[in-house]
Amino acid sequence: MGIPRTFLHCFLGSLLCLTGSQALQCYSYEHTYFGPFDLSAVKLPSVSCPEGCSEVVLSLDTGYRSLVTMVRKGCWTGPTTGPMQTNQDALPPDYAVVRGCATDYCNSNLKTHDALPNLSQAPNPQTLSGTECYACLGTHPEDCSPEKSRRVQCHQDQSACFQGNGRMNIGNFSVPVYIRTCHRPSCTTMGTTSPWTSIDLQGYCCEGHLCNRASVTQILPGTMSSAPPRAPRILTLLTAAPLLAIALGASVGFPA
């Protein structure tokens, strides 16, 4: 497990002052995707913004080819700088890009899923832990029922199974998420945080063949149909986009 790192960077001078009294015209868009997105041919509406424009992409992945991605474009809100804490070993994997700018219709850079890395990339060489878990990710409990979940062979040191639920947040744009996937026995709870985005997950890890088949709407473990979990660890994962102090005119993307 890596040691959490904290960054605080301050942008001085005019970058902190969102200059100009005239309102900017910015693209406005909010949508949740369950696969790759492409906005290159989409005509986006506009909105008048007093301070600046922003565009944010936030993605959560099981690590086994199931993902939920939020895309938001609109007015810049929140602080222009802020602290970040991250742990590269936290699971499940996530990624975020936050970009701010201060000219008309400048929030048009993040158009396709190419802005994100592959969060389900198999290790090379491809080694397996010998554990099999259910894997799913969706925005409704029925999206993650055992019947709709895939059985996956876990990678490398991921010898535990995880299940849980929570919310993905970009400002006041928020969606629920329900998830099952592989995890490490440590069931790392130290995710990442930032002032602009967050993914707040509650759940637990278990050990045993396909042990993560209980209801994803409950936090405490129920009766398992296979081997009982070893000392389930109740956890809250804060897997927010690890963003370090962005000023308008900059963009940052980090994995967790």
From Swiss-Prot:
Quick check: keyword Lipoprotein in the entry? yes
- Give glycosylation sites per the record: 118, 172
Taxonomically, the superkingdom here is Eukaryota
Lipid-modified residues, GPI-anchor amidated serine kind:
225
The annotated topology with respect to the bilayer is: Lipid-anchor; GPI-anchor
SUPFAM superfamilies tied to this protein:
Snake toxin-like (SSF57302)
- Residue ranges constituting the UPAR/Ly6 domain according to the UniProt record: 133-212
Q: Which residues form the signal peptide?
A: 1-25
Keyword annotations of the record:
Cell membrane, Glycoprotein, GPI-anchor, Lipoprotein, Membrane, Repeat, Signal
| Propeptide section residues | 226-256
Q: Would the keyword DNA-binding be found if you checked this record's keyword annotation?
A: no
Subcellular location per UniProt equals: Cell membrane
Instruction: Look up the record and report any one GO term of the cellular component aspect.
Output: plasma membrane
Name the PANTHER family for this protein.
Answer: LY6_PLAUR DOMAIN-CONTAINING PROTEIN 5, UROKINASE PLASMINOGEN ACTIVATOR SURFACE RECEPTOR-RELATED
- Protein's name in the database: Ly6/PLAUR domain-containing protein 5
Q: What is the lineage of its organism?
A: Eukaryota, Metazoa, Chordata, Craniata, Vertebrata
